[in-house]
Amino acid sequence: MLFRSASGPHAATFARLREQGLDIRVVEGGIGAASAVKMCYAALTKGLMALASQAFASASRLGVAEALRTELATSRPWVLDEADKGLPKVPPKAYRWIAEMEEIGATFAAAGFTPDLFEAVADVYRQVGAMEPGPLKDADQYAERLLAALTRRPTAAD
């Protein structure tokens, strides 16, 4: 998906690019409107993957992974499906998402909110970036590999 902001006659020009097969979404508004949509969209999609990273890894470490999976399958099956399909795709992208999460924090700060939440999400993606590469089948395998990466991380005492 490619977000571009345009208004007036420029919106019509961008809209015509759809005829060439490009997935263009015109966002009405001034400069920065499309970037704001992109940041808010990524906050939800990539933020959910960061939450799922910590939730599944923590559940695994605490011995309640199967109970979490059962609860999600019953009450929020779409979340379980998103985690099982999405988390295995995250590690090769994590290094790129760190700066994006920091940018989301700055965007939210400009809207009057604390940037702390997405600075912490950037830290989650730093941890994910330390995972060993290789295929993963679901959220449970992802969690185990993330926990292994956390175990290998050097500490301040090293």
Model regions: which residues?
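Short loop segments at secondary-structure junctions
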Residues: 7-10
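Short, small-residue-biased leader/transition segments that mark boundaries at the very start
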Residues: 1-2
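Helical "substrate-binding/catalytic lid" subdomain
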Residues: 37-139
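Short, basic/aromatic-enriched C-terminal tail that caps enzymatic domains
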Residues: 137-158
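Electropositive, surface-exposed helix/loop patches at the edges of structured domains
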Residues: 22-31, 102-116, 151-157
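Acidic-glycine-rich active-site phosphate/pyrophosphate-binding loop
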Residues: 12-32, 77-78
